[in-house]
Amino acid sequence: MSNTVVTGEVLDKSIREVVRILEDAVGCTAGPKGLTVAISKPYGSPEITKDGYKVMKSIKPEEPLAAAIASIITQSASQCNDKVGDGTTTCSILTAKVIEEVSKAKAAGSDIVSIKNGILKAKEAVLTALMSMRREVEEDEIAQVATLSANGDKNIGSKIAQCVKEVGKDGVITVEESKGFKDLEVEKTDGMQFDRGYLSPYFVTNAEKMLVEFENPYIFLTEKKINLVQSILPILENVARSGRPLLIIAEDVEGEALSTLVLNKLRGGLQVAAVKAPGFGDRRKDMLGDIAVIVGAKYVVNDELAVKMEDIALSDLGTAKSVRITKDATTIIGSVDSSSESIASRTNQIKAQIENSSSDYDKEKLRERLAKLSGGVAVLKVGGSSEVEVKERKDRVEDALHATRAAVEEGVVPGGGAALLYALSSLDGLKGKNDDEQWGIDIIRRAACAPIKRIIKNSGSEEAPCVIQHLLKQNDKELIYNVDTMNYANAFTSGVMDPLKVVRIAFDLAVSLAAVFMTLNAVVVDVPSKNDAAGAGAGGM
């Protein structure tokens, strides 16, 4: 294996080609009339999806330079997905347009540093303008936000709104595949979520989404640090014999204990994962007690307890219907052994503590515990007549759920690409220090029109230039173009609105990524040698 350095026009041409390929594949999914994409798999039937992030991740060019460029772009899309769970398609469309315009500036011999300064100056102005357009989302608008993100599927929108009503705006909502044929079902169950993720990525069971997913696991709780595997060996052996997974929630798991658990998992032994307990000090102790009540665990092992780790039996452990762990959070869904009486008793105890507390800070923390304990978990079960149908619908449900959370968190702006269009007024008084910096500002002006153009194009209409001209000429910044009805309407009464957080982060990341490519002067890529190819061939003989 040798490598080569690619520079100049060859590099610029490759960047343009890769960006165009990605935008064509991902951009076609934009809007309520966007199309689906089939992704072939090494085994089984192709997966059909409208999830822009999933489409982007699946594109892996064979040519080394193109593969390197695609990888850089996908990493940015991954950030968008991690931060908000939606907006990848918008991010891709914006990135492609900015890079296309920058390529023209480069070809004209413009000063790239000045162009970049103009772009970044315009970016800040647009982001400020977007913030000024936001408004809080009303409870009756939640279904509309979810429907729009689910490509116009009103059933998905109404079910997500039902979930929010069940557990509150800050409640825990998860999505699961159903065994039945019903499109969507909502199930309210006991459960809890806390802000601690897996201690090692090697615990992951779903590599595509970097998740740990356990069904019917045992749950062991301790306030102590676990350094030596010997101390929990009896628990591991008992759980292994049961054939069920194990979740360990402890102050910490480190050293020999963590490495042994990881090695065991990699060798295909016991399905196990470890997370740190939430909170600190006395609050950690209280929160572990809350979790114990939810999962029906008899003990939270600590130094005060006569029962040692080695003495814990299977019947002493907690249980749950399922557990879902990301790198940042753990969600416990549906206890098997807990009782509603024990949960009610614990909540009454916390309510009494709130009454008796004189500290506003303590009261706030107690209310947080009460909300986690009593709120429960809403589970959206996605069904269908085939595995392909279920997976495609689940993608849309998850996107809609992410959009809903973002809308609740930061509010909403006019949808369908209109918000970015109206934010362009912030550039009217913005002047560059020189012609090249002004060119950078104008690049953002053209790029911000790209999402609405793509949404209208995907609807089969060629009216995008006329629509953009009409929206920019009039003064009502709540007016949008609804591609479902092919008419103008008020964004908030018609339900065509986007979460500010999604639009803001997609735009910010797209411009930042394009700025990286602007100053990219060389890429070092590996090139397989003839000897490598011959060796690979000989291995198959």
Curated annotation (Swiss-Prot):
Gene Ontology annotations of biological process type: protein refolding
Relate the protein's function as given in its record.
Together with its co-chaperonin GroES, plays an essential role in assisting protein folding. The GroEL-GroES system forms a nano-cage that allows encapsulation of the non-native substrate proteins and provides a physical environment optimized to promote and accelerate protein folding.
Q: What is its main location?
A: cytoplasm
On assembly, the entry states:
Forms a cylinder of 14 subunits composed of two heptameric rings stacked back-to-back. Interacts with the co-chaperonin GroES.
User: Which PANTHER family would you find in this protein's record?
Assistant: 60 KDA HEAT SHOCK PROTEIN, MITOCHONDRIAL
Determine the domain of life of the protein's source. Bacteria
Its EC number is 5.6.1.7
Q: Which Gene3D superfamilies match?
A: GroEL, GroEL-like equatorial domain, TCP-1-like chaperonin intermediate domain
Its EC top class is: isomerase
Similarity annotation: Belongs to the chaperonin (HSP60) family.
Compartments, as annotated in UniProt: Cytoplasm
Return one GO MF term: isomerase activity
Q: What is this protein called?
A: Chaperonin GroEL
Catalysed reaction(s) here are: ATP + H2O + a folded polypeptide = ADP + phosphate + an unfolded polypeptide
GO CC, one annotated term: cytoplasm
Return the InterPro entries for the record.
Chaperonin_Cpn60_CS (IPR018370), Cpn60/GroEL (IPR001844), Cpn60/GroEL/TCP-1 (IPR002423), GroEL-like_apical_dom_sf (IPR027409), GROEL-like_equatorial_sf (IPR027413), TCP-1-like_intermed_sf (IPR027410)
Which keywords does this Swiss-Prot/TrEMBL entry list?
A: ATP-binding, Chaperone, Cytoplasm, Isomerase, Nucleotide-binding
